[in-house]
Amino acid sequence: MDTAALAAGLAVGLGVIGPGLGIGILTAKSSEAIGRNPDAAGAVRTNMILGAALAEGLGILSFVLGILLWTKIR
């Protein structure tokens, strides 16, 4: 197995773990905040969606980087 292929796999795998965990924690805490204060649901939901989009951008960037590394290997 080529070490470059291993590096591409690790770049994608490890790069997606962080945003995945972050979005999970963000959703849990946002649901908890809405449960405690239902009047602020709109503001909390807006911030949650914005934060999830930014975190997902990092995951997509990692995925694209892995694809670029993989095509460079071939």
For every predicted segment, state its role.
Residues 1-74:
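Hydrophobic, small-residue-rich transmembrane alpha-helices and their short perimembrane loops
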